[in-house]
């Protein structure tokens, strides 16, 4: 299953809720302000780092660049472009958006 998170983890608890409910092996794609959850050295970075042992974590590269955090993305987070987003949606049987 593909889970998308579009809210900043510093504004809403969407990322926490996603991590608590996603099943092991799921893909988590951080988009829009959700990409702040992929940055290192923050209050949520340890939680996301731990989650990467159970999930594959992606961030939408255009959103990362737009927000000026490309140099702060954690090791292990895979950056994808819009075509990669489409591929993830096609590869997974279901998509859950966490708002």
Protein language model regions, located:
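Short, basic, glycine/proline-bearing loop/turn elements
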Residues: 1-4, 28-35, 69-71
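Short, glycine-rich nucleotide/cofactor-binding loops
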Residues: 2-14, 34-40
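Structural motif
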Residues: 5-8, 62, 99
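Histidine-anchored nucleotide/phosphate-binding helix
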Residues: 10-23, 28
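Short, conserved loop/helix-junction motifs that constitute active-site signature segments
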Residues: 20-24, 48-53
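Short internal beta-strands
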Residues: 27-32, 55-63
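Charged helix-capping and loop-helix junction motifs
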Residues: 41-47, 79
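C-terminal structural segments of small proteins and small subunits
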Residues: 67-99
């Amino acid at each position: 299953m593909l889970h998308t998170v579009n809210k900043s983890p510093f504004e809403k608890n969407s990322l926490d809720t996603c991590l608590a409910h996603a099943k092991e092996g799921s893909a988590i794609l951080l988009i829009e302000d959700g990409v702040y959850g992929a940055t290192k050295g923050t209050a949520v970075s340890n939680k996301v780092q731990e989650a990467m042992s159970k999930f594959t974590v992606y961030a939408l590269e255009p959103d990362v660049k737009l927000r000026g955090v490309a140099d702060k993305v954690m090791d292990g987070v895979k950056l994808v472009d819009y075509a990669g987003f489409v591929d993830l949606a096609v590869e997974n049987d279901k998509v859950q958006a966490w708002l």
